[in-house]
Amino acid sequence: MTAPVTVVGEVLIDILRSRDGDAVEHVGGSPANEAIGLARLGHPTRLATYFGTDPRGTRIANLMSREGIRLTPPSQQAPRTSTATAALDADGVAHYEFDLAWHFEMDRLELRRDEHVHTGSIAAALRPGREAVLEAVLRAREHSTISYDPNIRPALMGRPDQVLPMVERFVSCSDVVKASEDDVEWLYGDTPLPQVLDRWTELGASIGAITRGDEAMAISALGEHRWFQPPKVTVTDTVGAGDSAMAGLLSGLLDAGLLGGTFARERLRSTTWAVVQAAVARSLACAAITVSRSGANPPRRSQLPPSAA
């Protein structure tokens, strides 16, 4: 069995409005999507989060139970369950409006040794919860590997110059960092992607990944940059694509024994490109399957092509 994973971050209800105005609700939130993605790929997963006991919250709790994800206490104590309303443009790209409640009690989170801890998105960006999340990550890093996905939401996070210092603080705590090209452009302007990856490496990340939609994913590892082309698919929408990519990447690294405790961190730093490439192949396959379906609906391991399973 691979190392267990604790995901720290928000869960909410995605309200997806199609171009014809119809609305469909899905459980979402980047960290929650990543937790579901990891669980569906066979990894024991916990979610430390914050949502309500209203009907939407009950839907979330029931889904996590069905997916085999354990909620850490006190996850279900919010006054209401957060929502993100996504409207699709002509290209199927989602644009969001948020109604959020986020709070995190680090002292109530019991972190285990030799597990992997993942965080990012709104939970790692909005005060006051972000300071508690950062403290939890710093504490976990003493005995666990860390991954981070900033998943930038400009409407919520302020100006890039206000956000970048906190993003880089999380990067400096992390072994694996993944962001989208849009995230990187918002944070770093016109800085070339290889320079951004080099910056993450300087801060301490062993693997950096930048997704680029249907263009090649940029990967930094072992002192090199490489580019990996995603599979060609018919896109239904892009909701949850980056989350599935992150879950797939972590899954591949977990299977290789490169995430977990401090010994896994050393193995990650000295791995080979063949191992990294296998994890990237799973990442790209997971994202491709997700964009071919409506909403954030990551694949199960049995649905992956043999080359990525």
Where are these regions (language model features)?
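Short, conserved phosphate/pyrophosphate- and ester-handling motifs at nucleotide-, phospho-/glycolipid
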Residues: 38, 180, 242
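Short beta-strand scaffold segments in enzyme catalytic cores
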Residues: 36, 83-87, 216-219
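Short, glycine/acidic-enriched loop or turn micro-motifs at the edges of active sites
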Residues: 13, 17, 53, 152-154, ...
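Conserved N-terminal subdomain of the carbohydrate kinase-like
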Residues: 15, 43-126, 146, 306-309
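Glycine-rich phosphate/adenosyl-contacting loop at the front of the ribokinase-like
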Residues: 1-70, 294
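Conserved beta-alpha-beta core of the PfkB/ribokinase-like small-molecule kinase fold
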Residues: 116-198, 205, 214-216
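Conserved phosphate-binding/catalytic region of the ribokinase-like
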Residues: 1-4, 189-309
